[in-house]
Amino acid sequence: MGNTVAREDFEWVYTDQPHADRRKEILAKHPEIKALMKPDYNLIWVVMLMVAAQLTAFYLVRDLDWKWVVFWAYVFGSCISHSMTLAIHEISHNSAFGNGRAMWNRWFGIFANLPLGLPYSISFKRYHMDHHRYLGGDGIDVDIPTNFEGWFFCTRFRKFIWIVLQPFFYAIRPLCINPKPITRLEIINLLAQLFFDIVIYYLWGAKSIFYMLAGSVLGLGLHPISGHFIAEHYMFLKGHETYSYYGPLNLLTFNVGYHNEHHDFPNIPGKSLPLVKKIAAEYYDNLPQYNSWIKVLYDFVMDDTISPYSRMKRQLKGEVKQD
């Protein structure tokens, strides 16, 4: 478990990200894909059901023994929580109400955030738009690990710990790489979350709060669904920046595994990304792809050529516009 990864820096590239050019090519050849660029109103009802499911779980765990609270936090709560972060990802792209009602999406994102326990939705939206516009951009794309992460988490054991601690690095990384002024909506997100947490504690006590927070932390750390964090952009094959996953966990994650398709068409809801792949199969079928996020996690830890440094980075040119 002590083998050290030889890579000592990111993979610096001097070309633009591939998604804009591929999008133009696909739309020229398959203009019918434009019909998929519309809201997914079913997302609204799915999110409401997920919030209701977590509220029910908060009530049911309130008097359980602690061992069962921990058990259900990992077995059930972690899945719902991670799935909810990906619903928030969909909402950040205005998939719930459409681009014409952008603020409705922001308020709905704050609502979807409530059963996670920690404010997330508004800040995520701001940084995630940068990730799409400036994929791999040095000092802008906070999906890229810090130099410390690449340098320190360089053995199998340390990479395993890095996976466990993923939620903490995703929370801290923006402050290190690209800090932004706090906005009014972020303050509202924080206050709404604090109020919700206080109400849950008042109604059902510490075990419900623990279940909520533990489910979020565990679901974003050492968990099968968390394989998507690594599968999406870590360079397992030299020269390939984005990878899709076509396995069954897409059913729980709003098709976030269709990641090449998503970056090519970020304004198409996850529900319709399989149709994008079907229509433009000649563009996607031969790209590197995964069928198991668990295997991605295993390979990341055990492959001594892969580390947090295994990301493509680029120096941005021209004016950079951020949210």
UniProtKB/Swiss-Prot annotation:
Record flagged with keyword Endoplasmic reticulum: yes
Entry keyword set: Endoplasmic reticulum, Fatty acid biosynthesis, Fatty acid metabolism, Isomerase, Lipid biosynthesis, Lipid metabolism, Membrane, Oxidoreductase, Transmembrane, Transmembrane helix
GO cellular component labels: endoplasmic reticulum membrane
Tissue spec: Expressed in retina and retinal pigment epithelium by Mueller cells (at protein level).
Catalytic activity: an N-acylsphinganine + 2 Fe(II)-[cytochrome b5] + O2 + 2 H(+) = an N-acylsphing-4-enine + 2 Fe(III)-[cytochrome b5] + 2 H2O; all-trans-retinol = 11-cis-retinol; all-trans-retinol = 9-cis-retinol; all-trans-retinol = 13-cis-retinol
One GO molecular-function entry: cis-trans isomerase activity
Positions occupied by motif Histidine box-2: 128-132
Topology of the protein relative to the lipid bilayer: Multi-pass membrane protein
Domain of life: Eukaryota
Compartments where found: Endoplasmic reticulum membrane
Locus of motif Histidine box-1: 89-93
GO biological process: ceramide biosynthetic process; fatty acid biosynthetic process; myelin maintenance
Regions that span the bilayer: 41-61, 68-88, 102-122, 159-179, 185-205, 209-229
Chain positions of motif Histidine box-3: 259-263
EC number(s) per entry: 1.14.19.17, 5.2.1.-
A Pfam family this chain is assigned to: Lipid_DES
Entry function: Has sphingolipid-delta-4-desaturase activity. Converts D-erythro-sphinganine to D-erythro-sphingosine (E-sphing-4-enine). Catalyzes the equilibrium isomerization of retinols.
Membership in a protein family: Belongs to the fatty acid desaturase type 1 family. DEGS subfamily.
Subunit description: Interacts with RLBP1; the interaction increases synthesis of chromophore-precursors by DEGS1.
The protein's name in its UniProt record: Sphingolipid delta(4)-desaturase DES1
